[in-house]
């Protein structure tokens, strides 16, 4: 099993972790609400976990353009 992190805005792969490197408890998933967990985490048939996050480029774009938070997506 591996954890794969992808940007929720542009889809770029941010990184991956092998499950043997870290326990899922240390990732803080238990602190998410059920709605957040459903929106951010998906479990694949092969046992991998895909997590939606935000990449540095998209975070910088949001920091420079706060009104982008109003949109479901700001990538065109």
From Swiss-Prot:
Please list the residues that bind Zn(2+). 7, 10, 55, 58
Q: What induces it?
A: Induced at 2 hours after sporulation onset as part of the sigma-F regulon, followed by further induction after 3 hours as part of the sigma-G regulon; its concentration rises throughout sporulation (at protein level).
Look up keyword Membrane and say if it applies. no
Q: Where in the cell is it found?
A: Cytoplasm
Q: Which UniProt keywords apply?
A: Cytoplasm, Metal-binding, Sporulation, Transcription, Transcription regulation, Zinc
A biological process from GO: sporulation resulting in formation of a cellular spore
Asked if the Swiss-Prot or TrEMBL record annotates the protein with the keyword Metal-binding, the reply is yes
Q: Where is this motif: YXXY?
A: 68-71
Q: Name one GO molecular function term.
A: metal ion binding
Required cofactor(s): Zn(2+)
User: What does a knockout show?
Assistant: Cells missing this gene prolong the activity of sigma-F factor and do not fully induce the activity of sigma-G factor; sporulation efficiency is reduced 50-fold with most spores arresting in the engulfment stage (III). About 10-fold increased sensitivity to DNA damaging agents, 60% reduced chromosomal DNA transformation; plasmid transformation is unaffected. Partially suppresses DNA damaging agent sensitivity of recU deletions. Partially suppresses DNA damaging agent sensitivity of recU deletions.
Which positions carry the signal peptide feature in this UniProt record?
none
Extract one GO cellular component term from the record.
Answer: cytoplasm
Q: Which Pfam families match?
A: Fin
Described purpose of this protein according to its UniProt entry:
An anti-sigma factor for sporulation specific sigma-F factor, by antagonizing sigma-F it allows the switch to sigma-G factor and progression to the late sporulation development stages. Might stabilize or process Holliday junction intermediates, although this may be due to polar effects on the downstream mfd gene.
Q: State the name under which the record lists this protein.
A: Anti-sigma-F factor Fin
Whose protein is this, by species?
A: Bacillus subtilis (strain 168)
The gene behind this protein is fin
């Amino acid at each position: 099993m591996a954890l794969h992190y992808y940007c929720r805005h542009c889809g770029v792969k941010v990184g991956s972790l092998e499950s043997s490197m870290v326990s899922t408890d240390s990732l803080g998933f238990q602190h998410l609400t059920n709605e957040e967990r459903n929106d951010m985490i998906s479990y694949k048939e092969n046992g991998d976990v895909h997590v939606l996050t935000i990449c540095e480029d998209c975070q910088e774009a949001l920091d420079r353009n706060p009104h982008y938070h109003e949109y479901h997506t700001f990538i065109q």
